[in-house]
Amino acid sequence: MIKQPALAQEQYACVYAWLALLFFREVDDEGLIQLQSAEIADWLALLKRQPALAASVALLEQKIAALSLRQDAQLELAADFCGLFLMTDKKSALPYASQYPQQEPGMIKHLLLEAGMEVNDDFKEPADHLAIYLELLSHLHFSLGESFQQRRMNKLRQKTLSSLLEWLPEFTNNCLKHDPYGFYAALSQLLLAIVRFDDGKEDLSIVAAE
C-alpha cells in the first residue's frame, strides 16, 4: 500500500485558518457558495488522502452535500451556529476554553505571548475562543517554514496542540449532542481528527508544498 505524504506546513496553516473562520462567525451567502465550491471539494479530497482523516472528511462532505436539500440553507446554518456557539444553556457547545474545567485559566494568553502575538482590538470575543487557538496554529505552521525559528515554533506548536486537546474532545462531543442537522458536528469531528493527527508528529520536519 502506497503511503500518502504528510500534509505540508502551508496546508496545515490554510486548513486551520479556514476552520477558525467557520467556528468564529456564521456562514453568510458568500460563505455558503464557497463551502459548495470545487475549491473546497479539492481541499477536502487532499485531506481525505490521509487515512486518519478520511472518515471525518467523508462525513463533512455528506453534510455539505445535504445543504443543497435544506430550504434557506444559509439561514438554517446561522440558526445552528447561534444555538450551538452563542447560547449559554445546557444544549450548547460554547467555543471557549474557560468553559471547560480541564483547561488551565489564561493558557492562551501565555501561548500568544510566546508566539509574539496578541488579539486584535476588533476581536469582540474572549481571547480563549477556539478561533484564536486555530489562528495561532495557522501562524505557527507558517512560521515552521522559516528554518531559524523551527525548533522554537515546533515546541510552541506542541504546547498549543496539547492545550487545545485538553478541552476540544468535550467541545466536539457537545457539538455531536446538540447539532440536529450535523454540519457543525461533522466540522468539529474533522477539527479534532486534524488536531490529533498534527499532535502525533512530535518531530515535525519541514515539508514543502508542491
Curated annotation (Swiss-Prot):
GO terms for biological process: protein complex oligomerization; protein folding. It is found in: Cytoplasm. InterPro entries: Chaperone_TorD, DMSO/NO3_reduct_chaperone, HscB_C_sf, TorD-like_sf, TorD/DmsD_chaperones. Keywords: Chaperone, Cytoplasm. GO terms for cellular component: cytoplasm. It comes from the Bacteria. Its main location: cytoplasm. Pfam families: Nitrate_red_del. Gene3D superfamilies: 1.20.120.1820, HscB, C-terminal domain (1.20.1280.20). Belongs to the TorD/DmsD family. TorD subfamily. Involved in the biogenesis of TorA. Acts on TorA before the insertion of the molybdenum cofactor and, as a result, probably favors a conformation of the apoenzyme that is competent for acquiring the cofactor. This is Chaperone protein TorD. It comes from Salmonella paratyphi C (strain RKS4594).
